[in-house]
Swiss-Prot record:
Its main location: cytoplasm. SUPFAM superfamilies: Radical SAM enzymes. This is Lipoyl synthase. It catalyses: [[Fe-S] cluster scaffold protein carrying a second [4Fe-4S](2+) cluster] + N(6)-octanoyl-L-lysyl-[protein] + 2 oxidized [2Fe-2S]-[ferredoxin] + 2 S-adenosyl-L-methionine + 4 H(+) = [[Fe-S] cluster scaffold protein] + N(6)-[(R)-dihydrolipoyl]-L-lysyl-[protein] + 4 Fe(3+) + 2 hydrogen sulfide + 2 5'-deoxyadenosine + 2 L-methionine + 2 reduced [2Fe-2S]-[ferredoxin]. Residues 1-12 have a biased composition (Polar residues). It comes from the Bacteria. [4Fe-4S] cluster 1 binds at C60, C65, C71, S299. The lineage of its organism: Bacteria, Pseudomonadati, Pseudomonadota, Alphaproteobacteria, Hyphomicrobiales.
Amino acid sequence: MVTVLNTVNQSGRLRHPEKAHRPDNEVLKKPDWIRVKAPVSRGYGETREIVRSNKLVTVCEEAGCPNIGECWEKKHATFMIMGEICTRACAFCNISTGIPNALDPNEPENIAKAVKQMGLTHVVITSVDRDDLADGGAHHFAEVIKAVREAAPATTIEILTPDFLRKEGALEIVVKARPDVFNHNLETVPSKYLKVRPGARYFHSIRLLQRVKELDPTIFTKSGIMVGLGEERNEILQLMDDLRSADVDFMTIGQYLQPTRKHHPVIRFVKPDEFKSFETIGKTKGFLLVASSPLTRSSHHAGEDFAKLKAAREALYASRAS
């Protein structure tokens, strides 16, 4: 795989040739309901300093998350492990693509240290895709979970994983480490995979989530999608059914925002009332929790949502017992 610089936006960020050679797409003006404040608070600065001092990477920065100001002000951050270079070139994603560096053996300890420094009660850990590794990075995920458990036993752990495609036994390694929440995003409906997520397979991702529940039914499972990529409403409803058939507990739905002209265009901006309807429908389909709004992202309000998940499961068990 060759790594090139995308000089079109003069950012100096590493890009896979496929991204650099894509035709420019118009970037639509965002509607008023997607406006966010610039990150300038004291809490934001303190979080950034902790991240920098521990030489950590966050998906908040790498993916250009619109909620970074709100989350970092509250000293919430989603740590991205195994480097900042991904082996895939998804059309929606702003993370750099190329040949990754070797794993940092000190990363589990550094993540655990940051969790303790920030006083996190709930931490979200994600990663780039590492197709170059024999286990896809599963063992490294497990080591990070173990380190956080030892440093901050009271902190609940949520992971957002790649699909471990063609990595036999990888999922079992991660599940054995017993995260509290296992998140793997479908990202979009199956008809859009060839253009949006060409390196992945929709039904493999569904099966991955189902397998987590088979291995350990106590782990909460979660998945998210973006809308505004040209999908049809009935495709979203079918995707919900697919997730429920895999016994997924929690679904997130947010608006796709185009990072640069080289990325997949926004086909439309979905209005807030339509997001609300997805939330209502999702709950009737049996999800314990559905978060659906223009600015919803996988890790947004993750700590609060974990508390809601626990309460919803307890209420469900109580209703079955009565």
